[in-house]
Design a protein with these regions (language model features):
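Basic/polar N-terminal segments that are highly enriched at the extreme N-terminus
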Residues: 1-9
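Intrinsically disordered, low-complexity, positively charged segments
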Residues: 8-67
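Glycine- and acidic-residue-biased ligand/ion/polar-headgroup-sensing regions
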Residues: 44-60, 69-95
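Short amphipathic beta-strand/extended segments with alternating polar/hydrophobic composition
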Residues: 62-65, 99-103, 142-144
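Short, charged beta-turn/beta-strand-edge "cap" motif at the junction between a beta-strand
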Residues: 112-116
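Surface-exposed beta-loop interaction hotspot
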Residues: 117-162
């Protein structure tokens, strides 16, 4: 298991208007989120947001605190939304197991000490995309399945990103 992160600094809005495609991609595009048995993150100076991806293949991946958080564990002062965009898997948070299918979401509130990601089938691994922000209050963890989700389909399938 490997945890990687990079820090992205905010761009001056006036300067950003003059950026070419290469510079825009360098400053804003996040690539390589899903690498087998890695947790990859970008810590952004925009609202101290963390965007990341975890793709467990045959082993459990731990969501570790990264240096910019200056915290003993990842959710010490943060909350996180986790979305499965791959095969079936599950997330464990402080002993509670949340099975997650494709397009299902999990909210974990501030304070969960140990969070791990696992895939049900290494041949079709789960891909957990997550966004985390600072939290100033604690709310209960909650799994939203596809059956429970409020769905709104707009446009046509050919011209959308369903």
């Amino acid at each position: 298991m490997k945890t990687n992160f990079e820090i992205r600094y905010a761009s001056n809005p006036i300067d950003a208007k003059s950026y070419d495609t290469a510079r825009l991609r360098k400053d804003f595009l996040i690539e390589k989120l899903f690498v087998a048995n890695e947790v990859n993150m970008v810590y952004s100076m925009y609202d101290r947001m963390v965007v990341g991806g975890a793709m467990p293949v045959g082993e459990s991946l731990l969501l570790e605190a990264i240096d910019p958080l200056k915290a003993p564990y990842f959710l010490t002062r943060r909350e996180i939304g986790i979305f499965n965009v791959g095969g079936k898997g599950f997330v464990k948070a402080d002993g509670e197991t949340y099975p997650m299918d494709y397009k299902e979401a999990l909210y974990l509130g501030r304070g969960d000490r140990k969070v791990t990601f696992e895939s049900l089938d290494p041949e079709h691994p789960a891909k957990f995309y997550f966004c985390s922000s600072p939290a100033h209050a604690t709310y209960p963890d909650h799994l939203t399945t596809r059956d429970e989700a409020v769905k709104m389909e707009l446009g046509t399938l050919e011209e959308s990103n369903h």
